Amino acid sequence: MAVVAPRTLLLLLSGALALTQTWAGSHSMRYFSTSVSRPGRGEPRFIAVGYVDDTQFVRFDSDAASQRMEPRAPWMEQEEPEYWDRQTQISKTNAQIELESLRIALRYYNQSEDGSHTIQRMYGCDVGSDGRFLRGYQQDAYDGKDYIASNEDLRSWTAADMAAEITKRKWEAAHFAEQLRAYLEGTCVEWLRRYLENGKETLQRTDAPKTHTTHQAVSDHEATLKCWALSFYPAEITLTWQRDGEDQTQDTELVETRPAGDGTFQKWAAVVVPSGQEQRYTCHVQHEGLPKPLTLRWEPSSQPTIPIVGIIAGLVLFGAVIAGAVVAAVRWRRKSSDRKGGSYSQAASSDSAQGSDVSLTACKV
């Protein structure tokens, strides 16, 4: 996405992945959307993506040639044309609503129309291993900063500043929380269960991580030990370094989990150690795909070759996934969207409560 800098894109994905960490055995469906104004270059670019757990399944980009909601997972191909028509219309409606929300936000913050501004939203639901509703959420951001978010009870809102307080009062007067709660506890859960069944071969699988350690001297007195976990699914994983059995959390450099581009994930954890003391350090790996946690120790005689090509390819795809997929996720940075005088309406307004629509229609700030 041309209007978003690469560093921002990395933050977007890291935020998206952070959101996928739910309870063991639970599943989530989440939608991320971003609208970015570009003065002098036409209407804002609007991108929306949907995720079930760590897998992207739908995507809409207002700049795409098709101008349609498109499948991003094989198991979505079975949906009928009417489904795609409806979701496309919802996305186009949201793009127009967020265009107006951007204009309203300029007034709230007393900003000029010369600069580029961003509205973002994340909403979704989690279910337990039994398929029952666990929790729902909606969080919005303006220009990368928290704006407004639903509270845990889904009956009230938390505003981040005075501008968001205006939106909060409007939403309270229009009973938006009740509509959101009905969607999250009903429609969202119904569709998540459906997707988990249709895509169970992908969504309910576990791929154990491929692990190894590497060693790199950084001076005559110190070296970096790095613990690698590659090709794992789902994304949630724990990597920790210990020295003589004691956690080295404070001294560990831990990167965010990253998509490898093939449906699996990558992660590493590094620690700087005194030269000659490497054998005192062990890396501990915990993942759902492992029968029991792994313990790794660097062996001087078997220094593995770091799969540079695979890592670089993953990082390139990582940026691409973000730009296209999650130009929406800036770490729960929420879009301001309350309707100035209108209604919040769910994706299918009256009929979405009956499970006919998957996503929500936005609301103005």
UniProtKB/Swiss-Prot annotation:
Keywords: Disulfide bond, Glycoprotein, Immunity, Membrane, MHC I, Phosphoprotein, Signal, Transmembrane, Transmembrane helix. Residues 115-206 are annotated as: Alpha-2. Glycans are attached at N110. Residues 299-308 are annotated as: Connecting peptide. Residues 342-359 have a biased composition (Low complexity). GO terms for biological process: antigen processing and presentation of endogenous peptide antigen via MHC class I via ER pathway, TAP-independent; antigen processing and presentation of endogenous peptide antigen via MHC class Ib; immune response; positive regulation of T cell mediated cytotoxicity. It is a single-pass type I membrane protein. The modification Phosphoserine is found at S343, S345, S349, S352, S356, S359. The modification Phosphotyrosine is found at Y344. Residues 25-114 are annotated as: Alpha-1. GO terms for cellular component: early endosome membrane; ER to Golgi transport vesicle membrane; external side of plasma membrane; extracellular space; lumenal side of endoplasmic reticulum membrane; MHC class I protein complex; phagocytic vesicle membrane; recycling endosome membrane. Residues 333-365 are cytoplasmic. Its main location: membrane. Residues 1-24 form the signal peptide. Residues 338-365 are annotated as: Disordered. GO terms for molecular function: peptide antigen binding; signaling receptor binding. SMART domains: IGc1. PANTHER family: HLA CLASS I HISTOCOMPATIBILITY ANTIGEN, A ALPHA CHAIN, MHC CLASS I-RELATED. Belongs to the MHC class I family. Involved in the presentation of foreign antigens to the immune system. Heterodimer of an alpha chain and a beta chain (beta-2-microglobulin). This is Class I histocompatibility antigen, Gogo-A*0501 alpha chain.
